[in-house]
Amino acid sequence: MAATLLSQCYRIYNSDACKCVSSENHQTTGKRNGNRNLEFDSGISKPARLVLRDRYKVTKQVNDPALTRALRGFADSRLMEDALQLFDEMNKADAFLWNVMIKGFTSCGLYIEAVQFYSRMVFAGVKADTFTYPFVIKSVAGISSLEEGKKIHAMVIKLGFVSDVYVCNSLISLYMKLGCAWDAEKVFEEMPERDIVSWNSMISGYLALGDGFSSLMLFKEMLKCGFKPDRFSTMSALGACSHVYSPKMGKEIHCHAVRSRIETGDVMVMTSILDMYSKYGEVSYAERIFNGMIQRNIVAWNVMIGCYARNGRVTDAFLCFQKMSEQNGLQPDVITSINLLPASAILEGRTIHGYAMRRGFLPHMVLETALIDMYGECGQLKSAEVIFDRMAEKNVISWNSIIAAYVQNGKNYSALELFQELWDSSLVPDSTTIASILPAYAESLSLSEGREIHAYIVKSRYWSNTIILNSLVHMYAMCGDLEDARKCFNHILLKDVVSWNSIIMAYAVHGFGRISVWLFSEMIASRVNPNKSTFASLLAACSISGMVDEGWEYFESMKREYGIDPGIEHYGCMLDLIGRTGNFSAAKRFLEEMPFVPTARIWGSLLNASRNHKDITIAEFAAEQIFKMEHDNTGCYVLLLNMYAEAGRWEDVNRIKLLMESKGISRTSSRSTVEAKGKSHVFTNGDRSHVATNKIYEVLDVVSRMVGEEDIYVHCVSRLRPETLVKSRSNSPRRHSVRLATCFGLISTETGRRVTVRNNTRICRKCHEFLEKASRLTRREIVVGDSKIFHHFSNGRCSCGNYW
């Protein structure tokens, strides 16, 4: 009976199981399992295990081939309790048997036990070898212990194993997983010999850390060194191309995969290619890849659904979902729900939310994060907050989503508070966190804090990240520092379409439309294809700078040369441009021929043009259309009020005021912000609360007299009666917040330095004239950003050309 059972064991554990640890085994993965309730393999019966133990008791030979094979068999079959019991009965186990046990614990995801067993091995005086350390290092990575990793690395150096490629590959993976790219680079650079796994570990490690640029650069270096990419290299490189938005490089890697036949029949490589084109917005390419796939698993379907959803093809996304379920018999999983959410309006989003709850997909960290994204984009911030607060487990991506939701909904100070909370936690902000929070600094007007986060970016190895640099360009531009915005743009090595759009729009809002146009020509010369946002920025530049002919040329070239259908935003820019000429009959004709129903914003463009040309008839017509859509549009009421007051139509002024009061509409209080010595100072109209009030008003009086201003002005939106206005100083433009902030900036900054002020409303004409003269008088550049554009006052002139 015993002989029969032993022969059965020999048949089960053939000679292949006796091979020592190979390079393939170095890649073994396993999930962490905190207890010992492991899954038992039915291949070994309980009687067989008993016979093996009895054999050891009889033979007392540690090197008995049957027992060695049995121990290896227990470990390979994840029967670690039996393996441990058999091992403990062996008095003198050699390094091979210790390695078998460590490998077994690691393969089962029992990383703590594996590290403890290694310590026991060292304590027993058994010398570890090059087969020991790859699994020990993998277990250290599994418990995320950098301290233990450093100790193991030191031991590897002491034993002279740093020349072993498998040990070094494991160290690279360890350091990359723990976010220590510098240590991984050092190991990689000092390796006397590298294999494809060495390169793959570095390339995928950079990508996992959000450094797609370094990942791509290393992939190129690998090719130069004569290594042929395998499926893992290819998938990592494709992911890096998506991360840094490098369509040209992505297509080159795709072509290489086709030539090397890497993509043939490999569903994961094909899915990576599909995902890359999806993120580029190349839906037709993605469809071609998807339709050409011989095999499609749930991952491929999910990517295609996500492709449609991400690129605004909502109907196609749901049709693809339906086809997957009905024609292919695949059941939607949690990722399907995640990918459908971007295509969902609030109603469909709640439906998917309910479906996920019914299917038991929740709680699920990734799905909950996607729900936060969806509710944030739909303006349902409260729902997003509820989901975030109820999450049992949060990672940095969850924090990124709720921060982005706050920023998207204009809650910039809440976003900054949440970012500080994340900063104080054990989690480390990643590149997406930084890119998400930078717009909040731009909108909160905190340039000094923006510079602090910029310094962090440089120190945190994100200085080559295109997405972050794009956000920095936007932040500096919106904070009024066009020079630093340009410096960040120049630092971008892989400039994508967002990079060019950001810098084109930056110069546009600062009134330098000619430079925006020149940058567009540079963009085309760099072979970066423009998109809808590019032309929106370009047309805005033409409108702000009064380049009418150029604007028409770019508008007509959108469809003709680039195949881009103009959207409602482009028609709005063109209406601004036409309105600038004062040709309102042409503007009305343009509105009638427009293939869209005019929005309140479109009518607002006409209203603004009528204000600049003092055409009250057109203004009343445009305002009437706006009130049909937005009866409580504060800006529209205030603009009409100003126009009536400037025309001396006081009855209409009173009528508008009464109408605003009846609707509970109040005028937005003017507030100006200026930074001095790293601190923001806020002023309101007639403000006397500042500690330097006396000095501010002294400077204001001196400058006002020197520029030849009178002491009293009639303010057009005063609530006082017309006959009383001339007797009042309280509403004089001399006390407007933008002047107070400017004067404080003049006395609190070094002589000759630029003064930058942000104002939340449009500055009045009197203040505009004052600032022009003040810039010439003080020989200082004064930059004022109002609710529409930035004004660069220098030597008595403004970049807006007196049209804003």
Curated annotation (Swiss-Prot):
- Has the keyword Nucleotide-binding been applied to this entry? no
Q: Where in the cell is it found?
A: Plastid, Chloroplast
> What's a single GO BP term from this record?
RNA modification
Q: Which InterPro entries match?
A: DYW_dom (IPR032867), E_motif (IPR046848), Pentatricopeptide_rpt (IPR002885), PPR_At4g14850-like_plant (IPR046960), TPR-like_helical_dom_sf (IPR011990)
Q: Where is this region: Type DYW motif?
A: 710-804
Gene Ontology cellular component annotations, sorted alphabetically: chloroplast
Domain of life, per lineage: Eukaryota
Q: Which Pfam families match?
A: DYW_deaminase, E_motif, PPR, PPR_2
Query: Which parts of this chain are annotated as the region Type E(+) motif?
Result: 678-708
| Residue span of the annotated presequence | 1-19
Q: What is this protein called?
A: Pentatricopeptide repeat-containing protein At4g35130, chloroplastic
Q: Which organism was this protein described from?
A: Arabidopsis thaliana
Q: What is the lineage of its organism?
A: Eukaryota, Viridiplantae, Streptophyta, Embryophyta, Tracheophyta
The UniProt gene name for this protein comes to PCMP-H27
